[in-house]
Curated annotation (Swiss-Prot):
Keywords: Cytoplasm, mRNA processing, mRNA splicing, Nucleus, Spliceosome. Belongs to the CWC22 family. It comes from the Eukaryota. PROSITE patterns: MI. This is Pre-mRNA-splicing factor CWC22. Associated with the spliceosome. Its main location: cytoplasm.
């Protein structure tokens, strides 16, 4: 036999040397600066495409530093830069998060140093990021609370007037957004401004000895803001036309507060040699292909970013998946859920899988297709189906649903829609699946991610409107809520919240009832007693005892019934100012009014805290005038602090 020798050749990839990397760094720095200087509303889409050609992960420090410098130089471009960041953040959230961290740190530093220009620049940029839903509104509410505190560190008229001036600027920038998303907190802020206006008038009348005097400019500005609020900020748009370029389901919102420990990562601003330069470049090339939907044979002009096309300029074409594609997609979602080690990993993989599906459909159809909502609904539905097929319920699925809902309103509305769908067809499921579904949705309700006023508004707990399967589902939902929250918290949320009562009267019929509703009340009482939750029926029993039979109703009975109705209505009205909506913080989205508070509004936010307030928000004008020690102001600040804690 002949001996054969085999020689193996190993190919070593030579990494670019320091000189090459440094030259590339300098060129990229100049390129980023030039692109940002030439940015206009008309070329923002082309600029985004050019920026994505740059490795934004490698050069994120340069990019963020340059955009902050440009915004300081030209503060009027804040809306334009906010729109640009919103697009990039929807694809690379790390960049949006780093920018927010640096802006908050810049604000804190310059607020202590009283550097007015940098304070204004930071605040304006932060406000625009909130309007674009890159940043949650909790941060700006905390800043407003800090600015309007009665006990400022330096009780100086100039400092106080500067703080008020800054607060007015914030409300001009974000008032319309806060009116829509955090109405309860906004009302507190407006009430505080009214107190400041009254105290300032008294101080000026007393020659400055009665308190902090208001400058004429601030007095007029406060009156202007209050006038805007009375008109529901109707004439102020949240985002200018042409700059709302990211679809709701694609927005990434960061939750950052003043108390968070933040890092500016300044080392990203300076050059350093990358020992794995080519590997990192190849990783970004793959990411860029996902973002832009590139193929080897597509012309650059065909590379569009899905999120930067508005839905208002053309008619959308709806394209559904074929049956085979749908089955394959569902199978992939199932395998992804089953193979993940944690809920965080599962959500990350599912969203990445969903994004690839959108890019594939877009490339295939060559046109803008309305597949985003369809893909998201299929994904959410598969999470629910996977949960229902388990032998025993696992909170793993509940946390996946919780994290998806927390992303934005789009996902919240999808799960509300799916809950109503499964409630209507629940009789098709076996008992084991019923238990899993009940515990899954019970977890979402207990965690405050699904708004009860939207999910339960159509449920009627009567013998005619329910069947055994629906009642079993409701039983498991309530049992899961009791297990996670405790009976006292569930009672506080469901029974003692006057705002919620009109929306869940089909389950707890205690308002606007008469003798005709006696059977429905008895059925509900019997249901909750049978499942061991009789403590939730106390108010219903009281209502039932005070109802008079329709056929035996005389004048005295009618008078008593009307009196009870008026009493219940009055109680509900008076308690509204003490009870916030229990909708989730970025997350529950109930647009229904909370009733009259001290400041009249017509529309209310669906993003309010669902925890009841501890004290009445109404404060008499006379108390504000006579209380020179600022007790009312402190109470208002405490109320706002409680609300901010609940939002977090």
């Amino acid at each position: 036999m002949e001996n054969s020798t085999t020689t193996t050749t190993t190919t070593t990839v030579t990494q670019p040397d320091e000189s090459y990397q440094r030259t590339k760094w300098i060129e990229t720095k100049k390129n980023i600066k030039q692109l940002l200087q030439q940015l206009t509303p008309s070329n923002i889409k082309q600029t985004v495409l050019q920026l994505f050609q740059i490795n934004l992960l490698r050069y994120q420090g340069l990019f963020i530093r340059e955009i902050m410098k440009q915004q300081i130089r030209i503060t009027t471009n804040a809306e334009l830069y906010g729109s640009l960041i919103s697009i990039i953040n929807s694809k690379i959230p790390e960049i949006g998060e780093l920018l927010i961290n640096r802006l908050v740190l810049q604000f804190k530093k310059n607020y202590l140093q009283n550097n007015k220009n940098l304070i204004n620049s930071s605040i304006i940029f932060i406000c625009q990021l909130i309007n674009q839903q890159v940043l949650n509104e909790i941060l700006i509410l905390q800043i407003l609370q800090m600015l309007l505190e009665s006990n400022v560190p330096n009780n100086n008229n100039n400092n106080n007037n500067n703080n008020i001036e800054l607060a007015i600027m914030v409300l001009k920038q974000t008032g319309s957004y806060l009116f829509k998303h955090s109405n309860t907190a906004l009302i507190m802020i407006l009430n505080r401004l009214k107190d400041i206006l009254q105290d300032g008038a008294n101080a000026n009348a007393n020659g400055g000895n009665g308190g902090v005097g208001l400058s004429s400019w601030n007095r007029k500005s406060i009156e202007y803001i209050l006038k805007l609020a009375r008109n529901d900020f109707k004439n102020i748009s949240i985002i200018k036309n042409g700059l709302d370029l990211v679809e709701t389901e694609d927005k990434e919102t960061h939750v950052i507060t003043l108390e968070d420990k933040l890092y500016s990562r300044d080392h990203l601003n300076v050059f350093s040699v990358d020992e794995e330069y080519l590997d990192h470049e190849n990783e970004y090339i793959e990411l860029k292909k996902e973002i832009l939907g590139e193929t080897d044979h597509e012309d650059e002009n065909e590379n569009e970013i899905q999120v930067i096309e508005t839905t208002k300029n053309y008619e959308e074409k709806i394209t559904d998946m074929s049956q085979s594609e749908l089955l394959q997609y569902q199978k992939t979602v199932y395998l992804t859920i089953m193979s993940s080690m944690s809920s965080d990993e599962a959500v990350h993989k599912l969203l990445k899988l969903n994004f690839k599906s959108k890019i594939k459909n877009k490339t295939k159809n060559k046109t803008k297709t309305k597949t985003n909502s369809n893909d998201n609904e299929i994904l959410a539905d598969m999470v629910i189906k996977c949960c229902s097929q388990e032998k025993t319920y696992s909170k793993y699925y509940g946390i996946i649903g919780e994290k998806l809902i927390s992303r934005n309103d789009h996902w919240h509305n999808l799960f509300i829609k799916l809950f109503k769908y499964y409630y209507d067809i629940i009789e098709n499921f076996e008992t084991n699946s019923l238990r899993n579904l009940g515990k899954f949705f019970g977890h979402l309700f207990a965690s405050d991610k699904l708004a009860l006023d939207q999910a339960w508004s159509n449920i009627k707990l009567t013998e005619q409107d329910t069947n055994p399967a629906k009642r079993i589902l409701l039983k498991f939902i309530f049992q899961e809520m009791i297990e996670e929250l405790g009976i006292n918290e569930v009672k506080e949320r469901l029974i003692n919240d006057d705002y919620l009562k009109p929306y869940i009267k089909g389950i707890f019929p205690v308002i606007n009832v008469d003798g005709k509703d006696a059977d429905a009340i008895r059925f509900s009482i019997n249901f909750f007693t049978a499942i061991g939750l009789g403590v939730l029926t106390e108010e219903m029993r009281y209502v039932l005892d005070n109802l008079s039979e329709p056929e035996e109703e005389d004048d005295r009975g009618r008078s008593r019934s009307r009196s009870y109705s008026r009493s219940a209505s009055s109680s509900s009205y008076n308690s509204r100012s003490r009870s916030y909506s229990r909708s989730q913080s970025r997350s529950s989205r109930s647009p229904n009014p909370r009733g009259r508070q001290r400041f009249k509004t017509k529309k209310h936010n669906h993003n309010e805290s669902r925890t009841p307030s501890r004290e009445n928000l109404k404060r008499k004008r006379s108390e504000s005038v006579t209380d020179r020690n600022g007790n009312n102001n402190n109470n208002n600040n405490n109320n706002l602090q409680d609300l901010l804690n609940n939002l977090k």
